[in-house]
């Protein structure tokens, strides 16, 4: 059985979708959720889903505590779901091509440090782009520059707001991310 860890900094909607998707699968277990924020909504979701959840501060991430936890739980694959910290080199070296992320734009557009959530959707609308979407990609040492696994597009509508665009992009995330993860295992 493959053991997955989900890393999330926010409310955890993608973490919940992924956990529910794999709940009935016999070959995959969501073993652990890690967050870097003590008040992240993902903590409550993890409790409801009966998945252990640990808070690891940014400082502790940099000092190797997250890697220790991942090894203790014998994690095979790492899924980032709205995780806002850069993954430290020690984790990258121990999990080559076994860490994936989802980004709410068609990378390389609107990627990099500080480009997450509403910031991305506001930038797409400000630029007047005709389409947006999601990018699922491997993680490397740079923000949002790892090898692309899948991109899925959606239209940007004339009356879109950051919220309406985000809603369509989230639906793409929920639909495609768990399936792509399963295909990579």
Label each region the model flagged:
Residues 1-185:
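One-carbon transfer enzymes
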